[in-house]
């Protein structure tokens, strides 16, 4: 997180305008500009645990991680700089939350890549903070307005749900596969053996569908779920509760908050961070799994067939198997043996 994103580079063109401002940074915070920009005061709120990790090291308690921002998170701020995410419902959840807390008269800046759909911010905020485009560079747009009316925000209205084979899946904006089970997860689920026992870790759990589907056929497994996303953590908790499944769910940057070892680690790892393609999380997952698997334990992941995971699996575990595949996806299995690097 040392190099600035294109969106931050656009903001830096206006850095003189922010020197006297008390700024709340929010949205898709993929670099540490909130900690480095010269301002009168800076706060940051994020729903992404890995972004909070970076910012909190430099900003301390002025960087906050949660699903819903509170009045304390925006205290004394007179300016919002919002980084538009690729997911419009996610932007609506976050902006309605933040604008319901900030005082009328707050300066509102929205910045984002054109391909992310940032221009739709104008319509979204038209009734609360009419926006005008004030800059365009690096294939990004920067919009400015002033808060004229606070929206009414009710987080409960953003919840959704769908059913998969009789299971109830609870979802929130920003959660992967919010509108239904994705093809990759379906393929991974098809490989899970009924009546499995032991401790299972679901990394990048999303809405929790892998775990509840696994638990239905293997009720004796002991589940732990983690994700970098606050909406995913809350959605997984709700999905487990809706299906009467027990499990521990918490925020973690891959294994950063995970303790202990498991008999099986399952994952449909992400390869996008915001608008950027990133293999870091999956490679960290594969390499770190050996420190969290019992002897004979198994890592089982699904990934797009074109992604270069076989080499990392072989380098880490000594070997791997492809146990299911389609034209687009492969399910990989690697076993913790003496060949595996112990990290």
Curated annotation (Swiss-Prot):
Query: Which cofactors are reported in the record for this sequence?
Result: Mg(2+)
Pfam family name, one: MTS
Tell me what reaction this enzyme catalyses: guanosine(1207) in 16S rRNA + S-adenosyl-L-methionine = N(2)-methylguanosine(1207) in 16S rRNA + S-adenosyl-L-homocysteine + H(+)
Give compartment(s): Cytoplasm
Its Enzyme Commission number(s) read: 2.1.1.172
The source's superkingdom equals Bacteria
**Record annotation: effect of changing residue 227 to A:** Strongly reduces affinity for S-adenosyl-L-methionine. Reduces activity by 87%
Q: Which InterPro entries match?
A: DNA_methylase_N6_adenine_CS (IPR002052), Mtase_sm_N (IPR013675), rRNA_ssu_MeTfrase_C (IPR023543), RsmC/RlmG (IPR046977), SAM-dependent_MTases_sf (IPR029063), Small_mtfrase_dom (IPR007848)
Q: What's one GO MF term for it?
A: rRNA (guanine-N2-)-methyltransferase activity
The UniProt entry's GO biological process terms, in alphabetical order, are: RNA folding; rRNA base methylation; rRNA methylation
What SUPFAM superfamilies does this protein's entry cite? S-adenosyl-L-methionine-dependent methyltransferases
The entry's keywords:
Cytoplasm, Magnesium, Methyltransferase, rRNA processing, S-adenosyl-L-methionine, Transferase
Which Gene Ontology terms of cellular component type are present?
cytoplasm; cytosol
Say what the protein does: Specifically methylates the guanine in position 1207 of 16S rRNA in the 30S particle.
| Subunit details | Monomer.
Family membership noted in the UniProt record: Belongs to the methyltransferase superfamily. RsmC family.
Protein name (record): Ribosomal RNA small subunit methyltransferase C
Species in which this protein is naturally found: Escherichia coli (strain K12)
